[in-house]
Every structure is written in C-alpha cells, then in structure tokens.
C-alpha cells in the first residue's frame, strides 16, 4: 500500500485489514512516498512520515513498512517501485492497494501499463462511493490495459 501517509490514519489501517482478509494476503507492506510527485508538499518530511507510518502499523503481524521510496532521493513512480519490488521478489504476486477513487486517474500516472502488468490492483470501495461507477472504471481499465483489478468493499 503506497501513499504519502501524511499522516497515516485509521482508514489506511482498516482498508489494509479488509483487503488482506478479502483477498487472503499474507502481509501488507506500507510504502510511504519519498519525494511527492502529485501532491502538494506538507509540513511532514519523508522521514517523519516514515516514522508516523511505523508507529501507526504498530505490532500488527501482517503489517510492515518499507523505506524503499523514502531512501530514494529522486522522484518515485509507482511503476518503478513495483518493478524494484518484483525484481527483488520475482516469485511473489503483488497487490497494490488504492482507494477506488484512484481508478479515475491511474491512466495519468507514469507508465500505467507497467503498473497493471506487475500487480493486481485492489481498489477499496468506501461507503458513499458509486459502486457501479467504480466497477465500470475497473472494467474499462481491464479492457484497455489487461489490468487485474479486485474491487473490495470496506
């Protein structure tokens, strides 16, 4: 689960729990971004966000935190982070957990085709979302990119 985690909150943890249970995941790795690409800068620097994420995850045995993006001083693109993770763990199957609203703009991310090749996207549908619209967007991305998308209700 990637994100700015500025700050990490209960919604992140609950979403991770729902997805892990719904999809039978062994673990969830939280990856705080280092240099933000799409969001405005904030008061919390990468090291602070990393420490906040570690504190939020606590002693949950299914959760861990990776510093892969925080240690990279350059721009971090999801496609490149997934590629690094895949190269380090070639036999693992990766799920990238996002809020369902992210499906609306994932095509605008750097190399979306590579993202969809390297992982299953787990789109978390929160209360109040138009589930039909989320499913329609997931179907569109599946058709256009061959994306593997699991919609999970939280």
Question: Can you describe what each PLM-predicted range is?
Answer:
Residues 1-154:
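Nucleotidyltransferase catalytic core that binds NTPs
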